[in-house]
């Protein structure tokens, strides 16, 4: 069988032919069509669930309590990570080759891939420790008995087992449910607060506005006041982004979904590998058709990707805004501490109406459990996709087996740090530093590489327009604004 589907009777010898798009993508505009578009929401649900759970419930209300609405602009600039996620996945769905594979080939001994892997292996245990702590606290609070560490460790081990034995479709479906619960909870809470929108909306566009700690923070929370505001800003920005973990994991998930060039392919990984081998021989992507009909077809096949990421960003932005606004309106001087990260935030729901407390508890559980459950898959997929071109051993290992090894590493390193957190190590500080690297620094490096590769290697007809490249670069520049707040 040839490398891939070849155009009829050699009319485009050596060129592939893109598969036909789903009927819904080419149908005439209608309400039914746009409702069916929602069925494409899949990998983006994992991104949304993991993104919200990786720190929104912890840092969002806390920042809202002392900064008010002044840092809502961080949600705006987090859009940069979604643009980068789109560009990276777009490159792969058009060419069949992952940008991560090109990083391995085009940098000295896969230097960039090693940087990504080191960032994950060094900082991931801190993240696992934070999740073990917060998930354990939520479980102990919900059920009313038991030590939070026992709850946290047991629940994380249970989630790891589910992730190993479960199929990707189960993970995707469960994350969609988790996201629905979170979205409903956030919208209900803010709707009942009835905030002043005219006071809130301008803050989304006041890029660079850096508040100082109020005087009451200095006196009532001296340990918080010791932390530089820009560090907390960067940590919070990291909770909003498509992190380095989910950026690379997303490339694997869209292959599993068989979107774009992978549509109708029985083995997307093998197909991608063949195209990569061809690229290694020629040094260019010379197999994409020049025919305008094929180019148009290829771009229509990108619609599921665009819809998936758009829905993901909207959900994350809405939920993130809700928790910061609720923190500003309701928490007052009650900033959540390392010991009671979640319990003290129950006021966000219960002060509105006591019956909303269970909704908050349910939202917390789904957010954190969804992060652990989806996160185990995301981290394993990220390290696997990043490392398979660096090591033949990784490439030869069956993915489920590799995932099991990653689970052991994450639990064996994260649980001891969670225990140290019980003895005084700051969970919020651990989370902020971790998200700074996997949610900000890693994104900037990946983004620069993706923009460069897209312009250099995609044939001109398949590149994004110059305006979109300019917008992406602009948002990347805005993305580093919090770093300048240290000056």
Model regions: which residues?
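Hydrophobic transmembrane alpha-helices that form the core helical bundles
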Residues: 112-144, 369-387, 426-427
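Membrane-water interface regions at transmembrane-helix termini and the short interhelical loops
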Residues: 134-142, 156-178, 184, 188-194, ...
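Hydrophobic alpha-helical segments and their helix-loop junctions in multi-pass secondary transporters
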Residues: 180-222, 243-252, 445-458, 482-487
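Loop-to-transmembrane helix boundary motifs in multi-pass membrane proteins
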Residues: 148-154, 387-422, 471-472
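Juxtamembrane transmembrane-helix boundary signature
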Residues: 47, 74-106, 116-123, 127, ...
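Membrane-interface loop-to-helix entry segments
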Residues: 162-196, 202-206, 432-445, 464-477
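Membrane-interface "cap" regions at the ends of multi-pass membrane proteins
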Residues: 4-57, 271-281, 297-306, 310
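Flexible loop linkers connecting adjacent transmembrane helices
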Residues: 19-25, 60-64, 86-111, 137-139, ...
């Amino acid at each position: 069988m040839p490398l891939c589907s070849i155009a009829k009777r050699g009319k485009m010898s050596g060129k592939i032919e893109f598969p036909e798009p789903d009927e819904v993508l080419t149908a005439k505009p209608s309400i039914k069509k746009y409702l069916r578009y929602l069925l494409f929401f899949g990998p983006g649900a994992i991104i949304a669930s993991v993104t919200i759970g990786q720190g929104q419930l912890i840092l969002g209300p806390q920042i809202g309590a002392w900064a008010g609405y002044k840092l809502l602009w961080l949600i705006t600039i987090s859009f940069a990570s979604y643009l980068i996620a789109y560009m990276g996945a777009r490159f792969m769905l058009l060419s069949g080759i992952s940008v991560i594979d090109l990083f391995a080939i085009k940098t000295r001994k896969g230097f960039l891939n090693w940087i990504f892997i080191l960032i994950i292996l060094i900082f991931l245990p801190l993240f696992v420790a934070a999740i073990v702590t917060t998930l354990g606290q939520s479980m102990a609070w919900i059920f009313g008995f038991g030590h939070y560490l026992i709850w946290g460790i047991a629940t994380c081990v249970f989630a790891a087992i589910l992730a190993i034995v479960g199929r990707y479709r189960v993970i995707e479906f469960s994350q969609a449910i988790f996201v629905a619960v979170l979205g409903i909870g956030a919208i209900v809470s803010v709707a009942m607060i009835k905030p002043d929108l005219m006071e809130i909306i301008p803050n989304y566009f006041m890029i660079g506005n850096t508040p100082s700690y109020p005087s009451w923070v200095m006196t009532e929370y001296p340990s918080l006041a010791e932390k530089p505001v820009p560090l907390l800003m960067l940590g919070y920005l990291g909770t909003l982004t498509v992190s380095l973990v989910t950026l690379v994991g997303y490339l694997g998930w869209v292959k599993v979904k068989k979107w774009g060039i992978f549509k109708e392919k029985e083995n997307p990984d093998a197909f991608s590998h063949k195209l990569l081998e061809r690229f290694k021989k020629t040094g260019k992507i010379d197999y994409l058709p020049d025919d305008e009909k094929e180019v148009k077809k290829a771009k229509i096949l990108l619609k599921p990707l665009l819809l998936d990421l758009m829905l993901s960003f909207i959900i994350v932005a809405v939920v993130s805004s809700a928790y910061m606004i609720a923190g500003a309106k309701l928490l007052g001087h009650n900033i959540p501490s390392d010991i009671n990260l979640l319990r003290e935030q129950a006021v966000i729901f219960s002060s509105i109406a006591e019956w909303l407390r269970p909704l908050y508890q349910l939202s917390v559980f789904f957010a954190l459990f969804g992060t652990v459950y989806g996160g185990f898959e995301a981290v394993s997929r990220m390290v696997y996709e990043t490392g398979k071109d660096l090591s033949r051993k990784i490439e030869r290992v069956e993915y489920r087996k590799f995932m099991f090894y990653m689970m052991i590493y994450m639990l064996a390193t994260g649980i001891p740090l969670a225990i140290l957190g019980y003895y005084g190590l700051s969970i919020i500080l651990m989370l902020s530093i971790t998200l700074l690297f996997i949610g900000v620094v890693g994104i900037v490096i990946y983004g620069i590489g993706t923009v460069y590769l897209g312009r250099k290697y995609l044939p001109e007809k398949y590149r994004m327009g110059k305006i979109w490249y300019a917008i992406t670069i602009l948002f990347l520049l805005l993305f580093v604004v919090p770093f300048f707040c240290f000056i």
